[in-house]
Every structure is written in structure tokens, then in C-alpha cells.
Amino acid sequence: MADVAARIPLVDYLVLDGSPRLRANECTSCGARYFDRRNACAGCFETGFRRVDIATDGEVRAFTIVTFAAPGVPVPFVAAVVDCHGTSVRANLINVEPSPEHVRLGMKVRLATYVVGTDDNGTEAIGFGFEPA
């Protein structure tokens, strides 16, 4: 049997067990969702939260083609806001040509993961983006 590389998510809200998905903190009072940990909801100031899985598909609501970035970051790439059935997710679009001819508002996309890097022990750091559906 082949060894399976250990995998760790690049961000805490990316869940890799089973089918990859994003998990948010949802306010138990008003339903606002946050990917980071909160002490109180920014919408209603309540303090109760539950963890919820986010839909793995959605539509591009806004995007920009980034042509200038920090040293070492390959350009161009597409930064987008994806509406995942009511939850906004900021992420890069991957596996698509970064040009206006290939990206459009309302474009259907789905969550995808990729290896960001591998350490000396073979552990893979896994990132996420959205690709055309």
C-alpha cells in the first residue's frame, strides 16, 4: 500500500476530511456568517455561534484581474467574490485563463483545492480557490 501524504489546510476554515469544504461560524441570533473567529457578531452583537458548512458551488459576483502583486506572487490571477448560496467567499479563481474573455459575472464555479507547498517531511499545505463548474 502506498503512503498517503499528510495534508494540512492553509486556513482553519478549509475542511479536508471527506469532501473538501469551507466551514463558517454562524451567529445563532441573526445568521450572519464569518470565516474568522468572533467574540461577538458584527451585525447584532450577540455572542452565540455554531459551525456550518458552506455550499461548495456558487456564482462569481465580483472579480478583478490582478496584474501587479507582491514579489514572488505569480501574475496575472483572478481575485473574486463568490456567492455560495448566500454566503460571500473571497478567493482566487483557479484553472481558468485570467482574462475578461474567460471570466464573467454570474459565472458558475465550484470549490477546488490545490497543493501550495510541501515540507521536508512530505506534508502538503492545501489551499483553495474556485474553478469553472
Positions of PLM-derived features:
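OB-fold/S1-family single-stranded nucleic acid-binding modules
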Residues: 114-133
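Short, cysteine/histidine-rich loop/knuckle motifs that typically chelate Zn2+
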Residues: 26-29, 40-46
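Conserved hydrophobic positions within beta-strands
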Residues: 58-60, 93
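Beta-strand/loop nucleic-acid-binding surfaces
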Residues: 88-99
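Short functional micro-motifs and their immediate structural scaffolds
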Residues: 35, 48-50
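Short nucleic-acid-contacting surface segments enriched for D/E, G, S/T with interspersed K/R
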Residues: 97-110
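Residues immediately within or flanking Cys/His clusters that coordinate Zn2+
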Residues: 21-24, 38
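A broadly conserved sequence feature marking short terminus-proximal activation segments
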Residues: 1-22, 127-129, 133
